[in-house]
Swiss-Prot record:
Pfam families: Mqo. It catalyses: (S)-malate + a quinone = a quinol + oxaloacetate. HAMAP family: MQO (MF_00212). SUPFAM superfamilies: FAD/NAD(P)-binding domain (SSF51905). Gene3D superfamilies: D-Amino Acid Oxidase, subunit A, domain 2 (3.30.9.10), FAD/NAD(P)-binding domain (3.50.50.60). Keywords: FAD, Flavoprotein, Oxidoreductase, Tricarboxylic acid cycle. Pathway: Carbohydrate metabolism; tricarboxylic acid cycle; oxaloacetate from (S)-malate (quinone route): step 1/1. Its EC number is 1.1.5.4. PANTHER family: L-2-HYDROXYGLUTARATE DEHYDROGENASE, MITOCHONDRIAL. This is Probable malate:quinone oxidoreductase. NCBIfam families: mal_quin_oxido, PRK05257.1-1, PRK05257.1-4, PRK05257.2-1, PRK05257.2-5, PRK05257.3-1, PRK05257.3-2, PRK05257.3-3. The gene is mqo. Belongs to the MQO family.
Amino acid sequence: MSNDPIDVVLIGGGIMSATLGAMIQRVQPGWSIRIYESLGEVAQESSNPWNNAGTGHAALCELNYMPEAEDGTVDPAKAISINEQFQLSRQFWASLVAAGDLPEPQTFINSTPHMTFVRGRENVRYLRRRYEELKDQPLFAGMEYSEDAETIAEWAPLLTKKRNRKQRIAATRQLAGTDVDFGALTRALVDDLVASGAELALNHRVCSLKRTKDGLWRIRARHEVGRTPREALARFVFVGAGGGALHLLQKSGISEIEGFGGFPISGQFLRTTNPAIVAQHKAKVYGKAAVGAPPMSVPHLDTRVVDGETSLLFGPYAGFSPKFLKTGTWWDLPGSIRLGNIGPMLAVARDNFDLMKYLIGELMAGREKKLAALREFMPTAKSEDWELIAAGQRVQVMKKDERKGGVLQFGTEVIAAADGSIAGLLGASPGASTAVPIMVDLLKRCFPERFEGWLPVLRELIPTVGTTLNDRPEEAEFVLKRTAAVLKLAQ
């Protein structure tokens, strides 16, 4: 490896680093790029298809983006915002597919109807109100609603088969939903980066980040095969290491990370590959979260397409582990505690009793209780058809709050040094689905003097970047149809 400073170092071989690298390579093709990945392959943590649900998060079915207010009203603003962000990701992927820089789209994205399914009178009323708010929104065009069991049975037979006919049920369906294999997408993006001159350093664990007197970043890494140390200098560093990002940003010494902590939540899914069952369900069906449950724990029964094979997934079942990564250590959480963040972390523990109660309940749940949750969606589920698999770790952001002392923040947050020389990403859902708008915002924040010059290229890749679609019905319809045609998705 050369001793010359590297223009861009990406730490972590997941979807975020791959997306940022793909953008930088196109807006500034002469820059050198190196990716450090501690494991032997990229996309093995949160981006691995079995470590996430693979939902193309566009708020078509996820109720947590449109909660019911105390007065019974539902505000579509958050759902519209999430959908707008996903459209930017779709445009970026479509541009790379059209240019031949990504493989056949079916290798990483497939049409899968997105449904919401609820039970009980009050939940039915809520879903009806949600539908009324969304049905005329351009980005939600084509959404269907039904309280009729026979209609719902046509959409997703497993939901109604042998269900008590007296139970009030309702569902929405949006045929334009997607299932995304973020592992395959990450690998394809990284392959394209390497083919264009980027360097991929696998089995390299970054141990420290230090600022030099001349404004560069000194990166010390260890080759995990042979334990040999490596050093490099970088002009810009992105820490896209998933749950490992907090530790590395803390080691960098930037003041912007002070007061931030991480709350790790583990997950499990039930999975079946039984062809007779899989053939009866082609949808991602989301329900309503339990009281206190974090957003990524909304129960859902999903069609998954991974490596061309179709299966069904149900969950997630949340749990607690102090590990920040699936391959992390039991010291991850205690090792992240600092004088500057212990106050916010204690405040979060004090104010989130419902979450703690929920997690304890999930930890205590045995297989029969997990199957009972599945049978609320699929009454005919049999234990012998389903296996329990471990999903990835999610580290929720805890941060200072002037009023409460500390708050638990769901979603993602970009932490960047004031001079823009280093940035990292904390948090979870909707995460990968909105990687493209997150990285566009990061470029604008970290390279303000260059961003205007990059905009023409970004607009070629993402035509509506910097604008919105939902308030322009004709443009929304055009973009949805164009990206669907390129990505071979339902329109």
